[in-house]
Amino acid sequence: MAITKERKNEIIAEYRTHESDTGSPEVQVAVLTAEINALNTHLRTHKKDFHSERGLLKMVGRRRHLLKYLRETDVQRYRELINRLGLRR
């Protein structure tokens, strides 16, 4: 279900804006996207895991708010992130 620490560090290294960046919106959205994808695969096999489904919905909401913030502050960074992650927007 959850992504491993090594995978999370790889994602942070790929999407960070500077050397010590771990909290920029790009990094947060990328980590949330990886967690959402992992949880989606879990929920495909465990259809009645409603507790995890609620966690998934909370993650999607958190990602939506971060994307909205990024879109309002810097549209260029928002578009680049959407393209890199392959999100539908």
UniProtKB/Swiss-Prot annotation:
SMART domains: Ribosomal_S15
A Gene Ontology BP annotation from the UniProt entry: translation
Domain of life: Bacteria
GO MF annotation list: rRNA binding; structural constituent of ribosome
InterPro entries registered for this protein in UniProt: Ribosomal_uS15, Ribosomal_uS15_bac-type, uS15_NS1_RNA-bd_sf
GO cellular component: cytosolic small ribosomal subunit
Key words of the record: Ribonucleoprotein, Ribosomal protein, RNA-binding, rRNA-binding
Coiled-coil region(s): none
Homology family: Belongs to the universal ribosomal protein uS15 family.
Quaternary structure and partners: Part of the 30S ribosomal subunit. Forms a bridge to the 50S subunit in the 70S ribosome, contacting the 23S rRNA.
Role, per record: One of the primary rRNA binding proteins, it binds directly to 16S rRNA where it helps nucleate assembly of the platform of the 30S subunit by binding and bridging several RNA helices of the 16S rRNA. Forms an intersubunit bridge (bridge B4) with the 23S rRNA of the 50S subunit in the ribosome.
Protein name stated in the entry: Small ribosomal subunit protein uS15
Organism annotation: Lysinibacillus sphaericus (strain C3-41)
